[in-house]
Amino acid sequence: MEFYDVIQQRRSIRKFKTDAIPQEKLGRILEAGRLAPSWANKQCWRFILVEDASMRKRLNEVMNGNPGATVYEDAPITLVICADPSNSGKKDNKEYYMLDIGIVTEHIMLAICAEGLGACWVGRFDERPIKNLLNIPEEYRAVAVIPIGFPDEQPDPKPRKELNTLLYQDQWKVQE
């Protein structure tokens, strides 16, 4: 799939077929994440690939109460992306690990789409039960949870703002 086609076609998928994901596809997706740029090349991320059905069920249970939790039920794989904030930059009151995780997660999300798969990036959850379940070390943050699978839905595109409402030329200007 061409790059700009991937960007235009990517959607948040919340319904999945239960078909297994070929390892070659999964390998390319994870490689896309591995190659993501990061602050000072620190690569503060770590990935937990949850394939075991009973572990995915337990993950779904600890996500209970999250409005996005139901997306895990049929996805054959869930990827949890973690970050070590101390292994990324902090400058001028900005913590760069969140930017690093945003970049690596978007690389992964686009690769998922390019492979003909679907995913939903879930970022709102209580991380303590997830850390306990997956034995994530205390210094790491669980930042993103991504169920992955073959889509069992084709959502329409969400409305996007027009570029001319987002872009300023040379300096910020008040819209009239």
Q: Model-found features: residue ranges?
A:
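Glycine/small-residue-rich phosphate/adenosyl-binding loop
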Residues: 27, 31, 38-104
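A glycine-rich helix N-cap at a beta->alpha junction
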Residues: 67-74, 78, 135-157
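Alpha-helix/helix-capping structural signal
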Residues: 11, 54, 125-128
